[in-house]
Amino acid sequence: LLDELLASIGIPRADVYITNIVKDRPPENRDPFPDEIALYAPFLDRQIEAIKPKVIATLGRFSMQYVMNRYGLDFELDSISKIHGQVFETEMPWGDKIKIVPLYHPAAAIYNQHLKETLKKDFEVMKSFVASK
Protein backbone atom coordinates (compact mmCIF):
# COMPACT_ATOMS: atom_id res chain seq x y z
CA LEU A 1 0.00 0.00 0.00
CA LEU A 2 2.81 2.43 0.80
CA ASP A 3 4.36 2.01 -2.65
CA GLU A 4 0.93 2.60 -4.21
CA LEU A 5 0.40 5.77 -2.16
CA LEU A 6 3.84 7.11 -3.06
CA ALA A 7 3.29 6.37 -6.76
CA SER A 8 -0.06 8.19 -6.65
CA ILE A 9 1.77 11.44 -5.84
CA GLY A 10 4.72 10.87 -8.15
CA ILE A 11 7.34 9.87 -5.59
CA PRO A 12 9.43 6.85 -6.56
CA ARG A 13 9.99 4.45 -3.67
CA ALA A 14 13.73 4.71 -4.33
CA ASP A 15 13.57 8.42 -3.38
CA VAL A 16 12.17 7.70 0.08
CA TYR A 17 14.07 6.75 3.21
CA ILE A 18 11.93 4.69 5.56
CA THR A 19 12.91 3.83 9.10
CA ASN A 20 11.18 2.85 12.31
CA ILE A 21 11.35 4.44 15.70
CA VAL A 22 11.75 0.98 17.29
CA LYS A 23 14.25 -1.04 15.31
CA ASP A 24 12.86 -4.49 16.07
CA ARG A 25 9.24 -5.56 16.04
CA PRO A 26 7.66 -5.86 19.48
CA PRO A 27 6.37 -9.39 20.19
CA GLU A 28 2.94 -10.21 18.80
CA ASN A 29 2.90 -6.84 17.00
CA ARG A 30 2.03 -5.03 20.24
CA ASP A 31 2.54 -1.29 20.63
CA PRO A 32 6.08 -0.34 21.63
CA PHE A 33 6.65 0.42 25.29
CA PRO A 34 8.02 3.86 26.28
CA ASP A 35 11.34 2.32 27.38
CA GLU A 36 11.72 0.68 23.94
CA ILE A 37 11.13 4.01 22.21
CA ALA A 38 13.62 5.69 24.56
CA LEU A 39 16.21 2.99 23.83
CA TYR A 40 16.02 3.41 20.05
CA ALA A 41 15.28 7.16 19.83
CA PRO A 42 18.97 8.21 19.65
CA PHE A 43 19.41 6.01 16.57
CA LEU A 44 16.44 7.67 14.87
CA ASP A 45 17.76 11.11 15.84
CA ARG A 46 21.13 10.33 14.23
CA GLN A 47 19.46 8.99 11.08
CA ILE A 48 17.42 12.17 10.72
CA GLU A 49 20.45 14.36 11.36
CA ALA A 50 22.53 12.45 8.79
CA ILE A 51 19.85 12.57 6.09
CA LYS A 52 18.67 16.13 6.79
CA PRO A 53 15.25 15.58 5.20
CA LYS A 54 13.10 18.42 3.90
CA VAL A 55 9.94 16.54 4.90
CA ILE A 56 9.26 13.93 7.55
CA ALA A 57 6.02 12.01 7.07
CA THR A 58 5.36 10.14 10.28
CA LEU A 59 3.47 6.88 9.82
CA GLY A 60 1.38 6.15 12.87
CA ARG A 61 0.90 7.68 16.27
CA PHE A 62 4.13 6.57 17.94
CA SER A 63 6.39 8.16 15.35
CA MET A 64 4.10 11.22 15.24
CA GLN A 65 4.32 11.69 19.01
CA TYR A 66 8.07 11.19 19.16
CA VAL A 67 8.98 13.38 16.17
CA MET A 68 6.64 16.22 17.10
CA ASN A 69 7.85 16.22 20.71
CA ARG A 70 11.50 15.93 19.70
CA TYR A 71 11.42 18.77 17.19
CA GLY A 72 9.49 21.38 19.14
CA LEU A 73 5.94 20.75 18.00
CA ASP A 74 4.65 19.31 21.27
CA PHE A 75 2.21 22.24 21.58
CA GLU A 76 0.58 21.09 18.29
CA LEU A 77 0.17 17.47 19.39
CA ASP A 78 -3.29 15.98 19.38
CA SER A 79 -4.65 12.58 18.47
CA ILE A 80 -3.64 11.32 15.05
CA SER A 81 -7.32 11.28 14.08
CA LYS A 82 -7.36 15.08 14.51
CA ILE A 83 -4.04 16.12 12.95
CA HIS A 84 -3.37 13.54 10.23
CA GLY A 85 -2.63 15.12 6.86
CA GLN A 86 -1.77 18.53 8.34
CA VAL A 87 1.57 20.16 7.64
CA PHE A 88 3.66 21.51 10.52
CA GLU A 89 6.86 23.46 10.01
CA THR A 90 9.73 23.45 12.47
CA GLU A 91 13.38 24.40 12.61
CA MET A 92 15.80 21.53 12.96
CA PRO A 93 18.93 21.54 15.15
CA TRP A 94 21.11 22.11 12.06
CA GLY A 95 19.15 25.26 11.16
CA ASP A 96 16.96 24.10 8.25
CA LYS A 97 13.21 24.47 8.36
CA ILE A 98 11.38 21.28 7.50
CA LYS A 99 7.83 20.08 7.21
CA ILE A 100 6.39 17.32 9.37
CA VAL A 101 3.24 15.58 8.16
CA PRO A 102 1.54 13.11 10.51
CA LEU A 103 -0.12 10.25 8.62
CA TYR A 104 -1.91 7.10 9.60
CA HIS A 105 0.27 4.03 9.27
CA PRO A 106 -0.66 2.24 6.02
CA ALA A 107 -1.06 -1.02 7.96
CA ALA A 108 -4.03 0.57 9.75
CA ALA A 109 -5.93 0.47 6.43
CA ILE A 110 -5.77 -3.33 6.56
CA TYR A 111 -7.96 -3.32 9.66
CA ASN A 112 -9.98 -0.23 8.81
CA GLN A 113 -10.81 0.00 5.09
CA HIS A 114 -12.09 3.60 5.16
CA LEU A 115 -8.59 4.70 6.19
CA LYS A 116 -7.31 3.84 2.71
CA GLU A 117 -9.23 6.79 1.23
CA THR A 118 -8.09 9.00 4.10
CA LEU A 119 -4.48 7.99 3.45
CA LYS A 120 -4.86 8.80 -0.26
CA LYS A 121 -6.16 12.28 0.58
CA ASP A 122 -3.42 12.83 3.16
CA PHE A 123 -0.72 11.79 0.70
CA GLU A 124 -2.10 14.37 -1.76
CA VAL A 125 -0.97 17.02 0.75
CA MET A 126 2.62 15.99 0.05
CA LYS A 127 2.25 16.35 -3.72
CA SER A 128 3.29 20.01 -3.52
CA PHE A 129 6.57 18.99 -1.87
CA VAL A 130 7.39 16.85 -4.91
CA ALA A 131 6.83 19.83 -7.21
CA SER A 132 9.12 22.02 -5.10
CA LYS A 133 11.96 19.49 -5.08
Residue ranges and their predicted role:
Residues 1-133:
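A polyanion-binding, active-site-adjacent surface
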